[in-house]
Design a protein with these regions (language model features):
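Gram-negative bacterial Sec-dependent N-terminal signal peptides
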Residues: 1-22
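Extracellular/periplasmic periplasmic-binding protein-like sensory domains
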Residues: 144, 246-317, 326-331, 383-409
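Solvent-exposed, acidic/polar segments of extracytosolic/periplasmic ligand-binding ectodomains
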Residues: 28, 348-410
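Signal peptide-proximal N-terminal region
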Residues: 24-25, 49-71, 196-201
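Extracellular/periplasmic Venus flytrap/periplasmic-binding protein
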Residues: 82-85, 136-137, 145-253, 288-296
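Periplasmic-binding protein-like
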Residues: 90-104, 121-131, 173-178, 229-239, ...
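Beta-alpha junction/loop-to-helix N-cap segments that form part of ligand/metal-binding clefts
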Residues: 27, 42-46, 61-138, 150, ...
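Extracytoplasmic "Venus flytrap"
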Residues: 27-52, 74-81, 102-103, 177-186, ...
Length: 410
């Protein structure tokens, strides 16, 4: 398995050669609408740093269009209503590129609002760049020409996760725990469907949804998991809802496996500590030991911010925008959106493609496991002495799932 992938710009350069530097020096404003406060605020703060860090890396000569990226975040307090107010404020200030990711309920509201705005305001169109919200509806029943997703959606992650789990013969009883909004509901739905198809002998012995970013003590949930006899937990929880969950598991003696999306995200590595070694897994488009240029950037990021870079979608957002703007020879959102469709290039995790039919990025995924950092996998998040080490790479075709999207194009 090849995990140390190098950045290769050749494919982007070939696609964009004639458009290179067509907008050289032009400033492109990007606004991210996500939480910076509250229990899930630390994740948003980390990602705000990430976008600012890579805005410098990918501005000017760092992208084939030669544009300058200017980035800021508006705190939406994880509220769809606050997000719509922030969207209006950004549009009124002339922003045409909106980023969001933390919370599919917010993403669905923004996608709908942006689509309606664009229909009513020709010439003032806005593009929605979704870096993390993984509800499959966003690229299926509720797909929009103006929405582009850079993370793998839940159907893709669960496809890869259960492909790995089906060969783990010690997994017999599974408990599914999630946040009570569209994301948690979809994780449970796809987990049950995929397990039934690939390992019908596995019993789903319990299922729970809890309020988003409100639970401070998960001990009662751990008690239910233990009482069910589950040897494995599947959860799409993120931020404090995952860090407090694994903390409660450690404190209350639960020794089963956890299959997660976000074990490497702010707060969870510290909550895990040296516990969970060999038992906590993460399915994602990256991990902490990708090698090559990514290692250099992560080291530089940690030196600058005393924090860990983990939202790799940030890099692909900048890569895709730069390539599409060069190809379109324009920063006009309509032309850029059309140029983004079907765009292929090599990123930190290999060749990726923005699928034209639904605007879902097709990409490799990795299963990694929590273990002690060593010479081969040295990066230690939150200075824990531990790391997420890759155990399986899934090529694009493995995790790719079909779409029902019937997209209306301009």
């Amino acid at each position: 398995m090849k995990f140390g992938l190098k950045f290769v710009a050749a494919s982007v350069a070939l696609v964009c050669a004639q458009g290179a530097f067509a907008q050289s020096g032009e400033t492109v404003k990007l606004v991210r609408i996500d939480p910076l406060t509250g229990l899930l605020g630390p994740v948003g703060v980390n990602q705000d740093k990430s976008y600012k860090f890579f805005a410098e890396k990918f501005s000017g000569a760092g992208n084939p269009a030669g544009v300058k990226f200017e980035f800021t975040t508006i705190d939406n307090k994880l509220s769809p209503t606050e997000s719509l107010n922030a969207l209006k404020a950004a549009i009124d200030q002339g922003v045409r590129y909106i980023i969001q990711g933390n919370g599919s309920s917010v993403a669905l509201a923004l996608s709908d609002a942006i689509t309606k705005h664009n229909e009513r305001n020709p010439g003032k169109e806005v593009i929605f760049l979704n870096d993390s919200a993984v509800d499959p509806d966003l690229t299926n029943s509720k797909c929009s020409f103006w929405h582009f997703r850079f993370d793998a959606d839940t159907s893709m992650k669960i496809e890869a996760m259960t492909t790995f789990m089906k060969d783990q013969k010690d997994i017999q009883k599974v408990y599914i725990l999630g946040q009570n909004y569209s994301h948690g509901v979809q994780v449970a739905k796809f987990a049950k469907e995929n397990l039934a198809r690939k390992r019908p002998d596995i019993q789903v012995v319990g299922e729970d949804l809890h309020p988003l970013a409100q639970v401070r003590d998960f001990a009662p949930y751990i008690a239910k998991i233990k009482a069910s006899g589950a040897d494995t937990v599947i959860t799409g929880n993120w931020g404090s809802d995952l860090s407090l969950l694994v903390k409660a598991a450690n404190e209350n003696g639960y020794t089963g496996k956890f299959f997660t999306y976000y074990a490497g995200v702010t707060g969870t590595p510290a909550a895990l500590g040296t516990n969970g070694a060999g038992r906590v897994y993460q399915i994602a488009y990256n991990h902490y030991n990708m090698g090559g240029q990514m290692d250099k950037w992560m080291t530089e990021f940690k030196t600058k911010y005393n924090d860990d870079f983990y939202t790799g979608s940030v890099i692909r957002v900048y890569q895709t925008l730069g390539a599409a703007m060069a190809k379109a020879k324009s920063t006009d959102p309509v032309k850029v959106a059309l140029a983004m469709e079907g765009l292929k290039f090599n990123s930190f995790n290999g060749e990726v493609e923005m699928r034209k039919t639904d605007h879902q990025l097709q990409q490799p995924l990795y299963m990694s496991v929590w273990q002690k950092a060593d010479k081969k996998y040295p990066y230690s998040p939150e200075n824990t002495g531990m790391t997420l080490a890759p155990v399986k790479e899934f090529a694009n075709y493995v995790s790719s799932t079909p779409t029902s999207c019937q997209m209306k194009r301009p």
